[in-house]
Structure formats: C-alpha cells, structure tokens
C-alpha cells in the first residue's frame, strides 16, 4: 500500500476527509487505495482523501502547473482525491481542513492573518488563519467570483 501507516481524520463544515503529510513524495495513492480508505463500511470512511505534499511530487501535474505553484509561492500542494478515487481540482472545505492539518504538522504558520499559499489543481489558493477556536481552527478561504445567469421570459 502506498499510504503511510498514520493518517488523520479531518472535518470541515460538514465534510470529512482522510489527511496525511507526504513531504518527500513517497506516498502517492492509487484510486483503489482511496476507494478502500474512504469506504464508510469497510474503510475509515470519508468524503475524500487529502495528501499534503510538494507540487513536484504530484504525478498528474504538468510542468506549467508546478511552475504556477512556484510563481505563487505555494511550497505545499493539496492533492485531493474524491471518495471514488478520481482526481479533484479543488474542494473549499478540503482547503480548510488541510490548512489546519498543515498548521498542526508544523509546515504552515499559526500566526493569525499569516497567509498560507496552497497549490491545488485549480491554482494557488491563499488562506489566512483567523485564530483558534479550541480544538478547531478558523480561517478565511477566498471563494472566487460568482457566476449568475438569467433568462428572459
């Protein structure tokens, strides 16, 4: 199995995740492993798997995507997998969970307002901790621009 022996169960605004730190790129999960771990009856159970790693260790990223992480000062990458094992571009609740996880692992600042730049398949996201609400964390996640469409009758 290409998953470390120790993982963390994380929750964020109604979603639950399995998270782990992979600082040297040794633990890239297979789709089957993700499905097994996320299975609510036979595994740990989760909406998805969050692997915190360096952008250069994510096999499906192009050189341009890795360069975009470098340009955006994102030392860390959220390699998010859906519970069915498929790759996901982004998950807002996942960014919340992985940021607190990164703080608890000592790879992100816990200073209130200090930006944590996180690479995702949807680009670099800048998250800012708003201070702890023990035992939970609080943070600000930019949500991008909303799209609205209207039809005329």
How should each PLM-predicted stretch be described?
Residues 1-133, 140:
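A glycine-rich beta-to-alpha transition motif near the start of alpha/beta enzyme domains, typified by
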Residues 136-146, 151-152:
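Low-complexity basic/metal-binding stretches
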């Amino acid at each position: 199995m290409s998953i470390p022996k120790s993982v963390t169960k994380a929750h964020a605004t109604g979603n639950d995740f399995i998270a782990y730190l992979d600082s040297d790129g040794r633990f890239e999960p297979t789709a089957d492993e993700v499905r097994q771990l996320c299975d609510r009856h036979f595994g740990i159970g989760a909406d998805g798997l969050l692997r915190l790693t360096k952008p250069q260790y994510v096999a499906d990223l192009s050189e341009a995507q890795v360069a975009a992480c470098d340009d955006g000062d994102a030392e860390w990458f959220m390699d998010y997998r859906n519970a069915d094992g498929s790759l996901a571009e982004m998950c807002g609740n996942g960014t919340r969970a992985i940021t607190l996880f990164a703080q608890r692992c000592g790879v992100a600042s816990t200073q209130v307002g200090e930006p944590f730049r996180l690479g995702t398949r949807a680009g670099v996201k800048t998250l800012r901790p708003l201070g702890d609400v023990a035992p939970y964390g609080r943070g600000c996640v930019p949500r991008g621009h909303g799209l609205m469409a209207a039809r005329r009758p």
